[in-house]
């Protein structure tokens, strides 16, 4: 049977976990084997900008950080389960990638 690897990423971990819980509930309801959600390391993207735009005065900086949270779910890809997963409402802040493998 084919397997599906579902990769989820988001800057909002609460919404990401909500989508993972919905997929987990679908897998339990349809009775397919599932592994995950496996949390991958959080990537922290950092940007430092200078507060003063004219270059005069003391050097003071703003530090901005964006954290990207990732999860991986491996699931058996039967037709009924995949139809239910495709109908899950996914927030705009969550990116999803589904890869089918044999």
From Swiss-Prot:
One of its GO terms (cellular component) is small ribosomal subunit. It comes from the Archaea. Keywords: Ribonucleoprotein, Ribosomal protein. SMART domains: Ribosomal_S10 (SM01403). InterPro entries: Ribosomal_uS10, Ribosomal_uS10_CS, Ribosomal_uS10_dom, Ribosomal_uS10_dom_sf, Ribosomal_uS10_euk/arc. GO terms for molecular function: structural constituent of ribosome; tRNA binding. PROSITE patterns: RIBOSOMAL_S10. GO terms for biological process: translation. SUPFAM superfamilies: Ribosomal protein S10. Belongs to the universal ribosomal protein uS10 family. Part of the 30S ribosomal subunit. Involved in the binding of tRNA to the ribosomes. This is Small ribosomal subunit protein uS10. It comes from Methanococcus maripaludis (strain C6 / ATCC BAA-1332).
């Amino acid at each position: 049977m084919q397997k599906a690897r579902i990769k989820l990423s988001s800057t909002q971990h609460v919404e990401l976990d909500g989508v993972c819980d919905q997929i987990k509930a679908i897998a339990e309801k349809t009775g397919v084997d599932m592994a995950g959600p496996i949390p991958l390391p959080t990537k922290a993207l950092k940007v430092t900008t200078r507060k003063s735009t004219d270059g005069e005065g003391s050097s003071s900086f703003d530090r901005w950080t964006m954290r990207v949270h990732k999860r991986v779910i491996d699931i058996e890809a039967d037709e009924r389960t995949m139809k239910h997963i495709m109908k899950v409402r996914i927030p705009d802040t969550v990116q999803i990638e589904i890869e089918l493998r044999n």
